[in-house]
Amino acid sequence: MTHDNKLQVEAIKRGTVIDHIPAQIGFKLLSLFKLTETDQRITIGLNLPSGEMGRKDLIKIENTFLSEDQVDQLALYAPQATVNRIDNYEVVGKSRPSLPERIDNVLVCPNSNCISHAEPVSSSFTVRKRANDIALKCKYCEKEFSHNVVLAN
């Protein structure tokens, strides 16, 4: 790295880096996945330059590691994301999200008549890949929605 190339977001000693998040999605991920419910330091880079994507978001969470299920649930929002496991400032593991069969406790059913809005139950959706889309079926009302409809909710 030359003196002209600087890290735009400070390195972390130990934790998780979620890189290659589409621009404007970083805050949504923080909220949906409750990543801010920690006392650990979180660094967010928004609209950073990216050779591949043009612009990207980035999230770094110190002393916190995502489970495989959490990584896979990112696939709906950031299918090209890379999740890096950091230890002693070095990348010790890399993973990419793959579409899970089910997503629990993250999304909200867009059907206003769904029982999940009135009862204290955790959301649960079955994930199905379609030709040009991803379908999400609510466990409670059994209605199927395009993932874009659920994500916009």
Curated annotation (Swiss-Prot):
The Gene Ontology biological process terms listed for this entry are:
'de novo' pyrimidine nucleobase biosynthetic process; pyrimidine nucleotide biosynthetic process
Q: Sorted alphabetically, which SUPFAM superfamilies does this protein's record hold?
A: Aspartate carbamoyltransferase, Regulatory-chain, C-terminal domain (SSF57825), Aspartate carbamoyltransferase, Regulatory-chain, N-terminal domain (SSF54893)
Q: Name one GO molecular function term.
A: metal ion binding
Which residues make up the binding site for Zn(2+)? 109, 114, 138, 141
**Gene Ontology terms: cellular component:** aspartate carbamoyltransferase complex
Q: What keywords tag this UniProt record?
A: Metal-binding, Pyrimidine biosynthesis, Zinc
The annotated subunit structure for this chain is: Contains catalytic and regulatory chains.
> This chain belongs to which protein, by name?
Aspartate carbamoyltransferase regulatory chain
Gene field? pyrI
What this protein is reported to do is described as: Involved in allosteric regulation of aspartate carbamoyltransferase.
Question: What PANTHER family does its record include?
Answer: ASPARTATE CARBAMOYLTRANSFERASE REGULATORY CHAIN (PTHR35805:SF1)
Family the entry assigns: Belongs to the PyrI family.
Q: How is the cofactor bound?
A: Binds 1 zinc ion per subunit.
Stored Pfam families: PyrI, PyrI_C
HAMAP family in the record: Asp_carb_tr_reg
- List required co-factors: Zn(2+)
